[in-house]
C-alpha cells in the first residue's frame, strides 16, 4: 500500500501499488503520469488535473476534488466488473479531449512515391469503468471530446447542468 500526503503534487512518472494507493493533497497534477493500484483514491483540497495521464484502480477508483476535477485527454478508469468508479467535485467535473497536430510527416507509398502531410487528432478524455461509473459535480459536468463508459450502470449528475460537445476543427 502507498499513502501519500502532499501539498502540491506534479506527477509525470509512475506511482504503482499492488494493493491500495491513496494520494491526498492541496492540488494534484498528473501530467502524462500513471497512478495505479488495486484500490486507487486521489483526493484534492482544491483541484485534481489529469493531463494525458492515467489514474487507474482495479476494484475501486475514486477521484475527488473540493473544487474541480479536470481530465484533459487523460484516462480515469476502473478495470474489474465487480468494482466502481467515482469521479466527484464540489464545483465542476471537466472531461475534455486534447487536440494535437503532427505535421510534415512523411508517408511513403512505395520506393518511387512519397508525400508529406499534416495529421490532426484528438486524445479523448476518458472516464471508463468495467463496473459502475458515477460522475457527480456540485455545479457542472462539461465534456468536449470526452466520454463516460461503464460495463454496468453509469450515472452523470450535476447541480446545474451537464454539457457534451464534439471537438471542433478550430
Regions found by a protein language model. Give the residues of each.
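Binding/recognition "hotspot" determinant
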Residues: 1-170
Amino acid at each position: 500500500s502507498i499513502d501519500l500526503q502532499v501539498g502540491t503534487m506534479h506527477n509525470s512518472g509512475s506511482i504503482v501499488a499492488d494493493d491500495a494507493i491513496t494520494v491526498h493533497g492541496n492540488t494534484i497534477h498528473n501530467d502524462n503520469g500513471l497512478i495505479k493500484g488495486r484500490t486507487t483514491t486521489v483526493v484534492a483540497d482544491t483541484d485534481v488535473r489529469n493531463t494525458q495521464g492515467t489514474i487507474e484502480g482495479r476494484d475501486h477508483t475514486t477521484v475527488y476534488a473540493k473544487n474541480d476535477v479536470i481530465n484533459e485527454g487523460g484516462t480515469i478508469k476502473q478495470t474489474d466488473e465487480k468494482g466502481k468508479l467515482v469521479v466527484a467535485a464540489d464545483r465542476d467535473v471537466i472531461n475534455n479531449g486534447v487536440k494535437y497536430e503532427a505535421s510534415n510527416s512523411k508517408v511513403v507509398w512505395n520506393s518511387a512515391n512519397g508525400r508529406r502531410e499534416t495529421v490532426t487528432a484528438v486524445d479523448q478524455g476518458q472516464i471508463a469503468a468495467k463496473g459502475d461509473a458515477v460522475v457527480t459535480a456540485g455545479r457542472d459536468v462539461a465534456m468536449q471530446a470526452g466520454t463516460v463508459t461503464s460495463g454496468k450502470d453509469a450515472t452523470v449528475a450535476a447541480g446545474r447542468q451537464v454539457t457534451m460537445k464534439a471537438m471542433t476543427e478550430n
